[in-house]
């Protein structure tokens, strides 16, 4: 009995450590969102040019997820994770010392390489290490780590950057990763790869119209969100004329509202995923259209951020449920593809946002983001009527 409780405790500790790792990996992807103005200032560049760093990072992750998954498919998982963390930490140290913008971009590419492999193996590892009968909870812990990065990671990164300089944000993430690595080394057993590394399931997945439709929806809606979200910090300061501190508060509110979205989805997501996703996309569309009108009043912006945060969290979780429901037989490859496609959207949104800021005006980012959001809303209503699939159809309850 004692051994069993100890092993359950250790199993949960392993999963929690992975969730913390997920938090750290996601925090670093989005940390620059809150630091664009500061980084631009120190290199004498425009924020829109610095924003290209987000696009490069996201597209490296998107391009490398599948190739790296195949290259590392035979590697023992514990050793692979340790190697990833060493690359991740070393790249953050380079970010800290970056003596030019080019060096900063190179350091970010190193981090993106580690990120691409990490996300292609994490869900499968969480499932393997979960206590018996607790796979769903283990996956939801990883999702929580990811979600919390949006909630607290970005604002905390921004606060550190405001008070100690943006370089300290990257150093702090590197130190957090070092502590997590120490825990992983202590807790993880040897984990031989169980993944065949075969791409045989790819053509099968792409022959599933429901899944392909969800992938298309993902890239369009994520592009819409990141067109505006990537530049929210300079928008608040230059267009709304509010302080840097207010930008931090707004990022905290937007992220914190994600918790409400997560709770709502937890209660209703399995049975009503389709309806919830469509409502959330409609809400995102409204927020993007109202971004500029709301910018003349700080309270209006705060209220808008709450709805925006709820919407984007429901969309992110909903897309994952749809992918898992459409590919219960190939979750590894399907989720790796999902991560890649999500990152294509992040990169595209950041790119569109930077071009709008450079060639139109930063004030227009909400309106331009609303165009793909409207397309996503129409597409979601079409595909969910055609394929009303939910996770429950594939995963009967096990008591």
Swiss-Prot record:
| SUPFAM superfamilies in alphabetical order | MFS general substrate transporter (SSF103473)
Q: Which CDD domains match?
A: MFS_NepI_like
Source species, domain of life: Bacteria
Cellular component GO terms, alphabetically? Answer: plasma membrane
Q: Which GO terms describe its molecular function?
A: carbohydrate transmembrane transporter activity
Mind telling me which residue stretches traverse the membrane in this protein? 15-35, 50-70, 81-101, 103-123, 136-156, 168-188, 209-229, 246-266, 273-293, 301-321, 333-353, 364-384
Q: Name one Pfam family in it.
A: MFS_1
Keywords, in A-Z order = Cell inner membrane, Cell membrane, Membrane, Sugar transport, Transmembrane, Transmembrane helix, Transport
PROSITE patterns on file? MFS (PS50850)
Membrane topology label: Multi-pass membrane protein
Compartments reported by the entry: Cell inner membrane
Query: Function of this protein?
Result: Involved in the efflux of sugars. The physiological role may be the reduction of the intracellular concentration of toxic sugars or sugar metabolites.
Instruction: Say which family it is in.
Output: Belongs to the major facilitator superfamily. SotB (TC 2.A.1.2) family.
The protein's name in its UniProt record: Probable sugar efflux transporter
What organism does the UniProt record list as the source? Klebsiella pneumoniae (strain 342)
Quote the gene name from the UniProt entry: sotB
């Amino acid at each position: 009995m004692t051994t069993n409780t100890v092993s359950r405790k250790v199993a949960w500790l392993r999963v929690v450590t992975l969730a913390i790792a997920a938090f750290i990996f996601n925090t670093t992807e989005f940390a620059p969102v809150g630091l664009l103005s500061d980084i631009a200032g120190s290199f004498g560049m425009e924020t829109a040019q610095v924003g290209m760093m987000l696009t490069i990072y996201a597209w490296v992750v998107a391009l490398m997820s599948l190739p790296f998954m195949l290259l590392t498919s035979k590697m023992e998982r514990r050793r692979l994770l340790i190697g990833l963390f060493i690359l991740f930490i070393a790249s953050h140290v380079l970010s800290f010392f970056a003596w030019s913008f080019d060096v900063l971009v190179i350091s970010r590419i190193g981090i993106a390489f580690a990120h691409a492999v990490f996300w292609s193996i994490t869900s499968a590892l969480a499932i393997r290490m979960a206590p018996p009968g607790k796979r769903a909870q283990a996956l939801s812990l990883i999702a929580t780590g990811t979600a919390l990065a949006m909630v607290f990671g970005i604002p905390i990164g921004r606060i550190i950057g405001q008070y100690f300089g943006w370089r300290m944000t990257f150093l702090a993430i590197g130190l957090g990763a070092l502590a997590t690595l120490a825990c992983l080394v202590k807790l993880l057993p040897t984990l031989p790869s169980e993944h065949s590394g075969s791409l045989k399931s790819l053509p099968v997945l792409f022959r599933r119209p429901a899944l392909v439709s969800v992938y298309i929806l993902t890239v369009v809606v994520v592009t819409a969100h990141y067109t505006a979200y990537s530049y929210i910090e300079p928008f608040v300061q230059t267009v709304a004329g509010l302080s840097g501190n207010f930008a931090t508060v707004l990022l905290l509110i937007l992220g914190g509202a994600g918790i409400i979205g997560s709770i709502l989805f937890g209660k209703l997501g399995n049975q009503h995923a389709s309806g919830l996703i469509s409502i959330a996309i409609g809400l995102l569309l409204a927020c993007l259209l109202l971004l500029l009108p709301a910018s003349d009043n700080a309270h209006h912006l705060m209220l808008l951020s709450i709805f925006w945060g709820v919407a984007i969290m429901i969309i992110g979780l909903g897309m994952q449920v749809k992918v898992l429901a459409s590919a219960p037989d190939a979750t590894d490859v399907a989720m790796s593809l999902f991560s890649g496609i999500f990152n294509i959207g992040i990169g595209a949104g950041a790119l569109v946002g930077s071009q709008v800021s450079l060639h139109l005006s930063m004030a227009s980012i909400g309106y331009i983001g609303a165009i793909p959001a409207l397309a996503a809303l129409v597409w979601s209503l079409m595909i969910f009527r055609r394929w009303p699939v939910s996770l429950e159809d594939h995963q009967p309850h096990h008591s």
